[in-house]
């Protein structure tokens, strides 16, 4: 049995940059040999790339952690460390990537070979050759590599279909798909025979072609999770035209018009935008007894409940089993599709701003101060912590440079305002030092 997985939660971590090197030339008349330490290489980024050969997120069922390699350390003679290769992660077309914490959409991957850098590799640390000045011609300062970005992501696959088949279970959606395309969905005389979306390519006699998806049957309450619930409703979101398949024979004992209203209510409840998509009503099983009578009653109820200014949906009587009325239905579907533009899947409020991922907002304070129960002052904040991890704490000159950076950020002044005294302990991460007033 083939497995279909359309959601996955994964972790990605880009590689850290390589550390810069402290090294000196050994030449006469050059103080301490002169600085000669090179920069570290850039860490590898994690890149998502669309592979049209993939159809599900099954590859992420057991492999949920993706980590790019770190850049090489800087070398002597001023040579740079080699940058790490990017980690390419293949995804099926139609994958939406969300931030698992905020739920915001990061990117929507639909085109073959489309790429998106989802976690950027860290910058390589600078070697001591970069810190030489007339006042300090032989610095013992080098930076550690910048950490790579690390994120928790939610992947959602929404299949790329132009036309979606919706309706109650066992109304004939799978049979319809199987006779108008080369798809071979599982067909049976019981509810929820279709438990995964099936995709087929339809080609009309006039030469038009489009992708059609048969989605698992909906029942009342699907938008709240009843039956297969919202598990597959997401796949309708990419469609431009909906074929609403209805069993006109009423073989299950339900009223066809009630079925029509119920399914539309579920679509509207799940996502109001789904009702913007044009629908064609497919009156199936017209070869069965009572179907003609039921269709006449259906049309009467539909007309009575439609506003005179609204366009009535087209109705096509067919029999998938007897192959009746299919050509006209497919031609009308192709024509409607040609006159329907793609719908915007997400608005600006759904999308995550780039600023939230890379760089710092200059208007935000670069650090925060709290105090632990043991009276230790604790400093934290993205910008401050980035400076800290890139500082080589094994070299006195690097520590002094870090202290100057803290002072320039206003840390000393802020600690005094909070009541810090000379000799108080200050902690950044796992590094502690005394506050000197």
Swiss-Prot record:
Annotated residues for binding of GTP: 167-174, 192-196, 214-217, 284-287, 319-321
A Pfam family per the record: DUF1967
Domain Obg: 2-160
GO biological process, one term: ribosome biogenesis
Residue ranges constituting the OCT domain according to the UniProt record: 359-437
Residue positions binding Mg(2+): 174, 194
Domain spans labelled OBG-type G: 161-338
Gene Ontology annotations for the cellular component aspect, listed alphabetically: cytoplasm
Cofactor(s) the record lists: Mg(2+)
PANTHER family in the record: DEVELOPMENTALLY REGULATED GTP-BINDING PROTEIN-RELATED, MITOCHONDRIAL RIBOSOME-ASSOCIATED GTPASE 2
Record's function text: An essential GTPase which binds GTP, GDP and possibly (p)ppGpp with moderate affinity, with high nucleotide exchange rates and a fairly low GTP hydrolysis rate. Plays a role in control of the cell cycle, stress response, ribosome biogenesis and in those bacteria that undergo differentiation, in morphogenesis control.
Assembly and binders: Monomer.
Protein name, entry field: GTPase Obg
């Amino acid at each position: 049995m083939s497995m279909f997985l359309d959601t996955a939660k994964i972790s990605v971590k880009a590689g850290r940059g390589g550390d810069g090197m402290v090294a000196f030339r050994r030449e006469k008349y050059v103080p301490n040999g002169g600085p000669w330490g090179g920069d570290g290489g850039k860490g590898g980024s994690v890149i998502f790339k669309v592979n049209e050969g993939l159809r599900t997120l099954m590859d992420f069922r057991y492999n949920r952690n993706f980590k790019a390699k770190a850049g090489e350390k800087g070398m002597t003679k001023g040579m740079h460390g080699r940058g790490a290769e990017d980690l390419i992660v293949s995804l099926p077309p139609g994958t939406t990537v969300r931030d698992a914490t905020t739920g915001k959409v990061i990117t929507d991957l639909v085109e073959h070979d489309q790429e998106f850098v989802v976690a950027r590799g860290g910058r390589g640390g600078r070697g001591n050759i970069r810190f030489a000045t007339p006042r300090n011609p032989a610095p013992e300062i080098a930076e550690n590599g910048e950490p790579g970005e690390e994120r928790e992501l939610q992947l959602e696959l929404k299949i790329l279909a132009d036309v979606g088949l919706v309706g109650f279970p066992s109304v004939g959606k799978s049979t319809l798909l199987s006779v108008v395309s080369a798809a071979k969905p599982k067909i049976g005389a019981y509810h929820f025979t279709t438990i995964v979306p099936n995709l087929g390519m339809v080609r009309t006699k006039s030469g038009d072609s489009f992708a059609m998806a048969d989605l698992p049957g909906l029942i009342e309450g699907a938008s709240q999770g009843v039956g297969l619930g919202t598990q597959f409703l997401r796949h309708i979101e990419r469609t431009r035209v909906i074929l609403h398949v209805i069993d006109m024979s009423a073989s299950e004992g339900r009223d066809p018009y009630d079925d029509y209203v119920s399914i539309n209510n579920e679509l509207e409840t799940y996502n109001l935008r789904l009702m913007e998509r044009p629908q064609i009503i497919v009156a199936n099983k017209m070869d069965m007894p009572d179907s003609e009578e039921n269709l006449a009653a259906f049309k009467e109820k539909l007309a009575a409940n439609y506003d005179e200014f609204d366009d009535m949906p087209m109705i096509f009587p067919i029999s998938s089993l007897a192959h009746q009325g299919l050509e006209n239905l497919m031609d009308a579907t192709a024509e409607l599709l040609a006159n329907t533009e793609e719908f915007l899947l997400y608005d600006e409020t759904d999308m995550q701003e780039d600023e939230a991922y890379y760089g710092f907002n200059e208007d935000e304070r670069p650090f925060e101060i709290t105090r632990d129960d043991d009276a230790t002052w604790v400093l934290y904040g993205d910008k401050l912590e980035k400076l800290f991890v890139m500082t080589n704490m094994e070299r006195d000159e690097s520590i002094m440079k870090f202290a100057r950076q803290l002072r320039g950020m206003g840390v000393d002044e802020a600690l005094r305002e909070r009541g810090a005294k000379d000799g108080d302990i200050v902690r950044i991460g796992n590094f502690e030092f005394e506050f000197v007033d």
